[in-house]
Amino acid sequence: MLKARFGGMKPRFAGVVSDNCPRNDAVVAPPKKSPSETVRREGADEVTVIEDFHRIKRLPPYVFAEVNALKAAARAGGADIIDLGMGNPDMQTPQHIVDKLVETVSKPRVHRYSASKGIPGLRRAQAAYYARRFGVKLNPETQIVATLGSKEGFANMAQAITAPGDVILTPNPTYPIHEFGFLISGASVRHLPTSNGDEFLAAVSRACRHTVPKPIAMVLNFPSNPTAMTATRDFYAEAVQLAKQEGLIILSDLAYAEIYFDGEPPPSVLEVPGAMDLAVEVTSLSKTYSMPGWRIGFAVGNERLIA
């Protein structure tokens, strides 16, 4: 039902075009539009009421809010719901992490403002993780920033690199922020079929040839939310080569890096030689350590994009 409602139909909101549109279609951002206003008279005064907000109007319905409303209605009717929706772990956060938090909050200095890009020790820990897990060397001073979860990191990156009229390539179906971050910045989104092989890369190449203006970035999300599809290093190598050829930025969402079942840990796009020239990757502690409410994530990669 959800696929039919949200993933399987042509988008009906501003700034989105699916890959099944005619190849010579131009994809452009909607024209600038001033908020419509109505005037309500109150005594001798005129009060202006703003009815529309341009950026908010560009966003489609938030799928999780709609699903939650359906679940609430079903539960109110007595249904026993097994929730397979949002990736919201219900396992206990590891005890040593909780104990460290309890110890730390008793120190007055931790309640002051933090460094904007995250405290040095946290960024060094992320650099050590990438070196250990992926064999990727990162400079914690210039290539890592701590974020309020991977979602906030992705949204901020999307808004930092795009301007009204820019075109971004995103998989479909995908996690909402992969579109929302760009739409709210005034950019346009072109959907490509979610795939971990030649089909996706061919769609990227085709979109770069036939989209006006030419796309500036593509989104990768493996392991994929919501499909659980994974990617190989070979796929990433081809994606990086294509991005270099077409002048694209790669934004990779690796929030599910540590959830796998076949003995093959998901790779990072940054393992590919040359990826650091054009890619930024976001990760999260939410899924790895069952800490979604803590809001801790990272954006790592190209120095200029991270800065």
PLM feature spans:
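Conserved core segment of the aminotransferase class I/II
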Residues: 271-307
